[in-house]
Swiss-Prot record:
The active site is at 260 (proton donor), 439 (proton acceptor). Residues 68-98 are annotated as: Disordered. Residues 208-230 are annotated as: Substrate binding loop 1. The lineage of its organism: Eukaryota, Fungi, Dikarya, Ascomycota, Pezizomycotina. This is 1,4-beta-D-glucan cellobiohydrolase CEL6A. Pfam families: CBM_1, Glyco_hydro_6. Substrate binds at residues 171, 173, 305, 308, 344, 405, 433, 437.
Length: 484
């Protein structure tokens, strides 16, 4: 299952004078690693690119500068209570970051909603994707325009520009994103809606910051540990999200809750980290569902995918687990159902089973949700579904095994977001994983290396999870179905 570190505050890196010619010959090429904790290779970039610190583990040569540069520590453009794991080049900008703020006594930046706050509540009934437009992720759009397109020409550049316009979910994968990208995006949506957007825009986001996150893998470990007060920190993170949702109650907001977390509770309880995290995961998921149960909010719990929970041995226990969470949270009206195939590659409705899915009878996402739905209903959770089709365009993929989740070869952008799913329990096809952001590094010496990213069916060389992966974006674009 793909692992992710996405959507943190926009940060900038300063540039130093070019080193001598002899050093320049050994500098990294564009997109290569140029620094980070434990890195022993070149710490400068060839002419035409800049070494930008992405997080403490990884710096990357990004296009933009016309001189050779050396890795520099980023400096935040905003006052926050937490440092960002995913700073970006100063060439990446998004209007979502530039929002009016005030400072609390704790020093955290807090958005002041323009125009005096909400004048109404964006309540709804039934399918929350009906009657609204999904908001295109401005951060992802900026990545495509500033990182992808400069390396492309002709039809590929034109197609890439079209990708940037497709709505995709924005990830709150660090505490710092809540009072920056999240609140800023809500401010942008409010401005667009007040300017007459018809139908109005809805915000689409992923809540993804559990302590001891990603308990069964290494590629996208989170910022908090359960042993170091992580539960209290997570509750404060959820409380901040709630604060902004209340401030922007005039905006319908759709949330996917904690990819991978509960699915790991079904299949990976043999992993010590998952055993230790299980009770906390459940407690904090229930807390999030209760706190975010607001009339303008719709929530979908992440439920893995057909190749994870769709197996006959897993699907029954999964239904019991999700129904239990639903009941423990008090059957929140804003919990609409489950999200499937997040950051994965499965097709929706296939005529035949890919070889790597055998012998699972639920070899695509449609079969999975149709098998899952009656079990959930019988357990007391009448769930609806959304499915991530962002990387499902090419079927079969180049995966050698179904569980090979990292930067899989032979994949393409898939069906565009729509409510025309042909299935009453399926609310929408959506793009949850922004295509082109890496699943995990192939560098075996990296602190967050996961062995799945070194398999023969994983595209290499790959940067750290969440960093821009130009070769992967081009693969998705080339194999897009329907094409751009």
């Amino acid at each position: 299952m793909a692992k992710r570190l996405l959507l943190t505050a926009a940060l900038a890196a300063t540039t130093l004078a070019a080193p001598v010619i002899e050093e320049r010959q050994n500098c990294g090429s564009v997109w290569s690693q140029c620094g980070g904790q434990g890195w022993t290779g070149a710490t400068c970039c060839a002419s035409g690119s800049t070494c930008v610190a992405q997080n403490q583990w990884y710096s990357q040569c990004l296009p933009g500068s016309q001189v050779t540069t050396t890795a520099q520590a980023p400096s935040s453009t905003r006052t926050t209570t937490s440092s960002s794991s995913r700073p970006t080049s100063s060439s990446i900008s998004t209007s979502a970051v530039n929002v009016p703020t005030t400072t609390t006594s704790a020093g955290a930046s807090v958005t002041v909603p323009p125009g005096g706050g909400a004048s109404s509540t964006a309540s709804y009934s039934g399918n929350p994707f009906l009657g609204v437009q999904q908001w295109a992720n401005s951060y992802y759009s900026s990545e495509v325009h500033t990182l992808a397109i400069p390396s492309l020409t002709g039809p590929m550049a034109t197609k890439a520009a079209a990708v940037a316009k497709v709505p995709s979910f924005q990830w709150m994968d660090r505490n710092v994103t809540v009072d920056t990208l999240f609140s800023g995006t809500l401010a942008d949506i409010r401005a667009a809606n007040r300017a007459g957007a018809n139908p109005p825009y809805a915000g689409i986001f992923v809540v993804y910051d559990l302590p001891d996150r990603d308990c069964a893998a290494a590629a996208s470990n989170g910022e908090w540990a359960i042993a170091d007060g992580g539960a209290a920190k997570y509750k404060a993170y959820i409380d901040r999200i709630r604060h902004h949702l209340v401030q922007y109650s005039d905006i319908r907001t759709i949330l996917v809750i904690e990819p991978d977390s509960l699915a790991n509770m079904v299949t990976n309880m043999n992993v010590p980290k998952c055993q230790g995290a299980a009770n906390t995961y459940k407690e904090l998921t229930v807390y999030a569902l209760k706190q975010l149960n607001l009339p303008n909010v719709a929530m979908y719990l992440d439920a893995g995918h057909a190749g994870w929970l769709g197996w006959p041995a897993n699907i029954g226990p999964a239904a019991e687990l999700f129904a239990g969470i639903y009941k423990d949270a008090g059957r929140p009206t804003s919990l609409r159902g489950l999200a499937t195939n997040v950051a994965n590659y499965n097709g929706w409705s296939l005529s035949s089973a890919p070889s790597y899915t055998t012998p699972n009878p639920n070899f695509d996402e449609k079969r999975f949700v149709q098998a899952f739905s009656p079990l959930l209903t019988a357990a007391g959770f009448p769930a609806h579904f959304i499915t991530d089709t962002g990387r499902s365009g090419k079927q079969p993929t180049g995966q050698l095994e179904w569980g090979h989740w990292c930067n899989a070869i032979g994949t393409g952008f898939g069906p565009r977001p729509t409510t025309d799913t042909g299935l009453d329990i399926e609310d929408a096809f959506v793009w949850i994983k922004p295509g082109g952001e890496c699943d995990g590094t192939s560098d075996t010496t990296a602190a967050r290396y996961d062995h799945h990213c070194g398999f023969a069916d994983a595209l290499k060389p790959a940067p750290e999870a969440g960093q821009w992966f130009q070769a992967y974006f081009e693969q998705l674009l080339t194999n897009a179905n329907p094409p751009f």
